[in-house]
Amino acid sequence: MATDEVNAAIPFTVFLLVSVMFYGLFDNLSGEDEGSGLDLIDPVWDYEHDTESGYGSVTGGFVYRGSNVPALYGKYVYGDFILGAIWSLELVDGKYVNELVYDTKANTSLTGNNRIPISSFGESESGELFFSDRSTGRIFTLNQTGSGEVTVESFKPDISIPLMIGLYNAGDSSNRIFAIEQVGRIHSFEIDGDSNDTTLLLDIVNNVESTDWEQGLLGLAFDPDFKNNGVFFITYTIPGDTLRLSKFIGDNETILLEIDQPYVNHNGGHIAFGPDGYLYVGLGDGGKYNDAFDHAQNLKTLKGSLLRLDVSGETYSIPSDNPFVGNSKDYKEEIFAYGFRNPWMFSFDRENGDLWVGDVGQDKWEEIDIVVAGGNYGWAFREGKQCFDSPFEHYDGHSCGEIDGWTFGAFMYERILLNLPLMIAFL
């Protein structure tokens, strides 16, 4: 951009900054829009990033309902991609208790690596848990010794699927596991028996944008009647930084929804059917960092939220009991809950229907949520149970649940600063 163009853009940029500040001050004093009078729902658990590396990245799991590991029955099992650890959560006397199940850093004999980067958990039809190693493409399962020790075992070690980020069952009594290869393939294999053969369900590599490690084929969900109708759903990123939700019967695709992304990361993309028969879709805040566009607290955008869709027809429709149906403020009626940074992954307890979400944090904290209709889970006013420490420190020290006009204006001002290069480039 020429110097005179930059100079011309500066006054307009300043105008935008001032406008947003005054919008935050006056509009939010009414208490009717995002950022004012927040009623944030606490995560059931949060944990701090590794003290040495400063990183962490939660991978949501399942409430264990299988029979092979009695010690974990009824506990929520989840892991961390960066730390390579697996934990369990259990409600005891009204408080959640977190226990380390397995530390792959301390047990490197399984792969020879420093850790297993746990990219996904999967559940068989009988309720047994598997998890994937994105780096080696191998699959592992949980088991229990006669003495009660929970162990991790390699599952069919001759099967290796590169960049594996998802494990699913089809609910069709076939006892197969389906594995997502991030570049755009879905493979299946039998759980029982000695066969290491894999079958290709879908190959859309030529349609998928997977340049960034958070892009690619991201989600898979089988129609509750898949055994009879062969219908399944996927999410994947396409060129132009767009997340697409599609319905498939064989190779025949019907595009249901496309969400433009301002950046390549924080697409979310995990999908699952709930016990109510509706499809739930997890969406990240659109990326970069600090929720650069304030998407997660803005009910007028789908980003940073969990959607609930009726996909029984040729196009999707909105269930009549979604929490924002019929609102007068142009809030997106597809939204079931909001205030998420990058939900990865979520599941329903097959016994009581509770919806558990692992939401990936940024600076210090990862969190586990039990999600309810209409709930606000706090990002980017809060990370885990803590007030989010903005690098600009405009609103440090304020109560996360009592964001006033000045504070919200500063919050929005920060977002303009974060996106200033984008704005100038656009101008």
What does each model-identified segment do?
Residues S195-F222:
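Blade-loop segments of beta-propeller domains
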